[in-house]
């Protein structure tokens, strides 16, 4: 090789070396801090400014950036005390490639942007909590390339598109994956490795989306899963037997289109609510028994056929004897007679030329004449009827609810529900005393008349001599409502959903004892009217977010409405549409979230509730606020049951309850001790 050639090679080598050094310098100069500030912040924030993300700037120490945690390559966390050393100034940290993002936690942070593709570039990122925001767009493929990620919560956003298959790349580390309450759709992708078991995965929540297709059977290979939620999607077909093998502690398959026989879950605690809202053909414990089994083995089928053939002779002979005996009967019971018999809790029926009165416990003294001749005074009008205060001939009063024509289901569907409602007796529920149906189909529900004020008027109306509402009194009202709801949900063989919880449907007496009205009425209404009730709940601010899709109330939607009601009690603010033209909407949970972010939580409480309170924390106000926000969680499975709500309210009573026993004290009369 000549000298010129050697010189040429030396020059080439020199330039390659310079280029390599330049590239290395560039890479070392780019850090997770720069990436977060340059790409992630703008993408997540969107068009509206987030108070949390405002701390992400060069003038604020990196360790004080809100919603993030940092760690060095050696595993030691970044502490603010480190900034006392010159080597840990913001300038040096911005360029330090050994500083890594460990956790991104920004729930309820008013994020209106999208998930950036660059999120996959954080090599040591372990947790991403971006739930309860307004993020849109798709889940980037690159999220599945974050090799250290173990906890992901993207619930309660507006993410759309399909779930990228790369998500299952995280299987080795993933412990919890939640995307509940988005607009994701399509068939769930299977892991690339056919035998992938996602051994560490414990929580998988894909509910509240639009996923379709058959049950994703690969999930049955995830042996470590303890909590599985596929609710409120459009899955269909059979639920695989393999699901029964998993050691699940929580399961929700409700509001899909699953059919056939459920697998054997052994001695599980799953109730019917875990499977409600599917195809009527879905059967097996805890639902109705299956008429025939689609899972029988060939041997079992053969045995069943032989048994049926041998039993056919016996059945035929019994049937002949029964028919011969039937002919000898002198009278045949009508369908109505059969429908109205054998009701142990029903006191009796009183029939006349104008219709039929079915009376329940406490309504024994009512007669048809009493009901038809009572003089009425309109108390309230709703989309499905009118409530009257009716004066009886003996001077007593009853409350009559006349159901609007066309609102109620047919008699055969309506009467069993009416009878169930007539059996309910609880001190925090207004009892149904009787039911009247006229010859022309008119229907009346008859209740005790209670000359009490509604909670709505107590909180929001300015009336003379209205009692002061200190915290002790508000707590008693809230606890009474919770107890009534808990009884509806768990105190019956068949749970009752209230379906219309609002402050107008709570009556409060002079001693601040609360009673719920209008429970269970959606069950007797035709679907169009039931939908109207749900729409009104949205207008009034009590509608649970999942009802946008399924429009069928359930215990969890009752819990959500109770959470709004508890916030209304604590804050003294009316939820829902407001203003002269109803063009403003008051979202109570959002007001609380904003106050928490701005560190002004104490300002959300009604001043009247705060009177005399030295420590809202000790008096249970702050705990009640947290409980209310838990009830209002966008993800249904996060919400507590009403039994748990009652327990928490009982355990966190106001310390000074003396003001409960002064019912005559009013806002204008005296200073409340609270």
Curated annotation (Swiss-Prot):
Residue spans of biased composition, Acidic residues class: 333-348
Domain of life of the native organism: Eukaryota
Boundaries of every Protein kinase domain copy: 373-674
Keywords noted in UniProt: Glycoprotein, Leucine-rich repeat, Membrane, Phosphoprotein, Receptor, Repeat, Signal, Transmembrane, Transmembrane helix
Residue numbers on the Extracellular membrane side: 26-295
Region listing for Disordered, in residue ranges: 331-350, 649-674
UniProt topology in membrane: Single-pass type I membrane protein
Modification Phosphothreonine occurs at: 375
Record-linked InterPro entries: Kinase-like_dom_sf (IPR011009), Leu-rich_rpt (IPR001611), LRR_dom_sf (IPR032675), LRR_N_plant-typ (IPR013210), PRK1-6/SRF4-like (IPR046959), Prot_kinase_dom (IPR000719), Ser-Thr/Tyr_kinase_cat_dom (IPR001245)
Modified-residue entries (Phosphoserine), positions: 334, 454
GO CC entries: plasma membrane; plasmodesma
Ranges facing Cytoplasmic side: 324-674
GO molecular function, one term: protein kinase activity
Transmembrane segments: 296-323
PANTHER family given in the database record: KINASE-LIKE PROTEIN TMKL1-RELATED, LEUCINE-RICH REPEAT RECEPTOR-LIKE PROTEIN KINASE PXC1
Family designation: Belongs to the protein kinase superfamily.
This protein's name: Putative kinase-like protein TMKL1
């Amino acid at each position: 090789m000549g000298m010129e050639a050697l010189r040429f090679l030396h020059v080439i080598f020199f330039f390659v070396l310079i280029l390599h050094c330049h590239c290395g310098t560039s890479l070392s100069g780019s850090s997770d801090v720069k990436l977060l500030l340059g790409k992630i912040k703008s993408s997540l924030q969107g068009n509206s400014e987030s108070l949390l993300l405002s701390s992400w700037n060069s003038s604020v120490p990196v360790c004080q950036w809100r919603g993030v945690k940092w760690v060095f390559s050696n595993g030691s966390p970044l502490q603010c005390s480190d900034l006392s050393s010159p080597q840990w100034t913001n300038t040096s940290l911005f360029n330090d490639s050994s500083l890594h993002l460990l956790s991104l936690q920004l729930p309820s942070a008013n994020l209106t942007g999208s998930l950036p593709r660059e999120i996959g570039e954080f090599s040591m990122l372990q947790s991403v909590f971006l739930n309860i925001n307004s993020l849109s767009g798709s889940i980037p493929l690159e999220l599945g390339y974050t090799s250290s990620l173990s906890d992901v919560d993207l619930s309660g956003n507006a993410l759309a598109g399909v779930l990228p298959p790369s998500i299952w790349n995280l299987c080795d580390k993933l412990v919890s994956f939640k995307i509940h309450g988005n607009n994701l759709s399509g068939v769930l992708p299977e892991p690339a490795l056919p035998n992938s078991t996602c051994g560490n995965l414990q929580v998988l929540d894909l509910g509240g989306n639009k996923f379709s297709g058959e049950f994703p059977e690969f999930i049955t290979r995830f042996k470590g899963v303890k909590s599985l939620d596929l609710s409120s999607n459009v899955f269909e077909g059979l639920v695989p037997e393999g699901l029964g093998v998993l050691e699940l502690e929580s399961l929700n398959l409700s509001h899909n289109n699953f059919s056939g026989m459920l697998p054997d879950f052994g001695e599980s605690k799953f109730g019917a609510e875990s499977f409600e809202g599917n195809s009527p053909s879905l059967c097996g414990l805890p639902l109705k028994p299956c008429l025939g089994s689609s899972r029988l083995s060939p041997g079992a089928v053969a045995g069943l056929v032989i048994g049926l053939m041998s039993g056919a002779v016996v059945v035929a002979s019994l049937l002949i004897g029964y028919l011969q005996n039937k002919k000898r009967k002198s009278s045949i019971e009508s369908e109505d007679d059969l429908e109205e018999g054998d009701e142990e809790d029903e006191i009796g029926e009183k029939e006349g030329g104008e219709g039929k009165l079915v009376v329940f416990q406490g309504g024994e003294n009512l007669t048809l004449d009493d009901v038809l001749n009572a003089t009425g005074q309109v108390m309230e009008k709703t989309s499905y009827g009118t409530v009257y205060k009716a004066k009886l001939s003996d001077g007593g009063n009853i409350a009559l609810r006349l159901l609007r024509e066309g609102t109620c289901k047919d008699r055969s569907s309506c009467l069993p529900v009416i009878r169930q409602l007539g059996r309910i007796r609880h001190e925090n529920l207004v009892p149904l005393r009787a039911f009247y149906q006229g010859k022309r189909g008119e229907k009346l529900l008859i209740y005790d008349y209670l000359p009490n004020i509604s909670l709505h008027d107590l909180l929001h109306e300015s009336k003379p001599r209205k009692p002061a509402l200190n915290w002790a009194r508000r707590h008693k009202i809230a606890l009474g409502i919770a107890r009534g709801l808990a009884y509806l949900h768990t105190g019956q063989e068949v749970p009752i959903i209230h379906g219309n919880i609002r402050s107008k449907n709570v009556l409060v007496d002079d001693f601040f004892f609360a009673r719920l009205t209008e429970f269970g009425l959606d069950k007797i209404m035709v679907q169009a009217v039931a939908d109207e009730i749900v729409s009104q709940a949205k207008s009034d601010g009590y509608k649970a977010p999942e009802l946008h899709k399924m429009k069928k109330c359930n215990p969890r939607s009752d819990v959500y409405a109770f959470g709004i009601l508890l916030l209304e009690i604590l804050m003294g603010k009316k939820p829902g549409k407001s203003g002269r033209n109803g063009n403003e909407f008051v979202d109570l949970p959002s007001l609380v979230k904003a106050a928490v972010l701005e560190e002004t939580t104490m300002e959300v409480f009604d001043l009247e509730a705060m009177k005399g309170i030295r420590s809202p924390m000790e008096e249970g106000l702050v705990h009640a606020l947290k409980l209310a926000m838990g009830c209002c969680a966008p993800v249904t499975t996060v919400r507590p049951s009403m039994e748990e709500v009652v327990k928490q309210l009982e355990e966190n009573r106001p310390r000074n309850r003396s003001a409960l026993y002064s019912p005559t004290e009013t806002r204008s009369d005296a200073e409340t001790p609270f």
